Amino acid sequence: MFNNNNEYECLCILEEKLVKHLDVIDKLIENIYDNINNLNEYINKKYNEIKILASKKPTRINWMKCDDKTHMSLFFDKKIGFIPSNEDALKILDSQLMLSNYRKKYEYKKNSWTKKDIDKLFETVDITLKKYACYYLIDQNLSCDEKINKKKMIEQSEPKQIFSQIKLFFDKYNKENTHNKGNEDNVNKNINDNISKNNITHTQNCYEPIEKEQDNSNNIFSYTKNDKNIEHNFLYFSETFWNEVSEKLSNNQNAKECQKMWLYYGCFEDDKQKKWTKDEVDKLLCLSKKYEQRNWKCIARELNTNRSPLSCFEQYIKINKLYENKEKVKLERIAFNVLEDIQLQILVSIIGDKNWAEVKKHMESLNSNTSRIKKRKTNLNFFEKEKQKKFLNDEISYKRRYLRLISATNNMEQ
């Protein structure tokens, strides 16, 4: 009897354990079913989103890349997990656009330039630049008549020419200092004496009040007292010059904004000056040999005829005729089917209308156009290729086809 009771108890314990294990298995099965349903819902949701994207205009979606192949991991990121839906992305984009538009409007209102402000800017630049030119470009050792003539020349010349002359002066001064480091103290003493004498002598000869001239000289050259070498640095000169111009203007503009505005309206070539003279062309050729057709900024500066570096480069190309031997590249067109048009529209709606290299990759992977392109390439002989030198650019052809399809659909809707 005792043995039978023990066996019965053991069987009861085993039965309880089995029941518990079965309950756990049932719960696991339920959880698995729930997970499968959630996955099915998520897949259906993403499928519907892709359908909506294909029907709408192109939007940007970040594709995950692995060995130069795009796959369905575009909906998954390792750090973040599943990225937000397209609706959330569109909301974020709208808010960013609103903020950017507000910022643009605010900046435009803050930095608005009127015609009066621009005229005043040109006047202040002209006056202050001529003061600096009288200080830097007129030597102390010259006679009184020569100084007056130089001052007249400075007053008649344009600001662009004065800037280039001051830059050349700084370059020469720096070159001399590299060779003669021992004579720095003597040169600085002579220039400091020029501050007091040069401006005062000009004022006496030109019948201008002496007290005003002295005040202006003190205001302009107040920074020379602390540093001796800093006044012969063009960068420091430009900073001080444009800071002074911005202080004199009534409109609250920075020195950089004043400089940009003056360069935009002042430093462009006149319509009358488009034709190049023989002297300019000869000088340009000499300077291009000197600088080995590279440093076009220095070439334009040494020309000293208000020519920009880009115009100097273009003129040099016209003279040497560098681009005559190169034949024009001809674009071959690809024929499209109706099915290919649909594929192209879907791909552009997913990838976007800017990354045409990706569009080309996917279109070629569908094996729709590649067979025709290969046939057309094999039909061409080797000698015909050398004569014609045709170039096939698939990206441009896909882009053109997509734009034509969009224009056709828009016309149909209208």
From Swiss-Prot:
A GO molecular function term, named singly, is: DNA binding
Asked if the keyword DNA-binding belongs to this entry, the reply reads yes
An example GO BP is: positive regulation of DNA-templated transcription
Write down any Gene Ontology CC term: nucleus
**Source species, domain of life:** Eukaryota
Output the PROSITE patterns linked to this UniProt entry. MYB_LIKE
Task: Tell me its applications.
Answer: Possible candidate for an effective malaria vaccine as determined by epitope response in sera.
Its chief place of residence is: nucleus
Domain Myb-like, which positions?
A: 242-266, 268-320, 328-381
Q: Where in the cell is it found?
A: Nucleus
What InterPro entries is this protein classified in?
Homeodomain-like_sf, Myb-like_DNA-bd, SANT/Myb
Cite the Pfam families for this sequence: Myb_DNA-bind_6
Q: What happens when the gene is disrupted?
A: dsRNA causes reduced expression, alters parasite growth and trophozoite to schizont transition during the erythrocytic cycle.
Keywords (alphabetical) are: Activator, DNA-binding, Merozoite, Nucleus, Repeat, Transcription, Transcription regulation
Please describe what this protein does. Answer: Transcriptional activator. Has a role in the parasite erythrocytic cycle where it directly regulates key genes involved in cell cycle regulation and progression. Binds directly to Myb regulatory elements.
Q: What is this protein called?
A: Myb1 protein
From what organism does this protein derive? Plasmodium falciparum (isolate 3D7)
Q: Which gene encodes it?
A: myb1
